[in-house]
């Protein structure tokens, strides 16, 4: 489970959050 800089888990089905999470992972 990757974690976004804000502390939000990337493991979610919310498309917008996945987008932000993917950006944070890069």
UniProtKB/Swiss-Prot annotation:
**List of catalytic residues:** 21 (acyl-thioester intermediate)
Post-translational changes noted in the entry:
Succinylation, adjacent to a coenzyme A binding site. Desuccinylated by SIRT5.
Quaternary data: Homotetramer.
Recorded superkingdom:
Eukaryota
Reaction catalysed? 2 acetyl-CoA = acetoacetyl-CoA + CoA
- Keyword Transferase applies: yes
**Protein's recorded name:** Acetyl-CoA acetyltransferase
Keyword list (alphabetical) reads:
Acyltransferase, Mitochondrion, Transferase
Provide the protein's localization: Mitochondrion
- Tell me the organism: Sus scrofa (Pig)
Q: What is its main location?
A: mitochondrion
Q: Which family does it belong to?
A: Belongs to the thiolase-like superfamily. Thiolase family.
- Please provide, alphabetically and separated by semicolons, the GO molecular function terms listed in this UniProt record: acetyl-CoA C-acetyltransferase activity
For this record, an example GO cellular component is:
mitochondrion
For this protein, what is the EC number? 2.3.1.9
């Amino acid at each position: 489970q990757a974690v976004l800089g804000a502390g939000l888990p990337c493991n979610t089905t919310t498309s917008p959050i996945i987008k932000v999470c993917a950006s944070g992972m890069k």
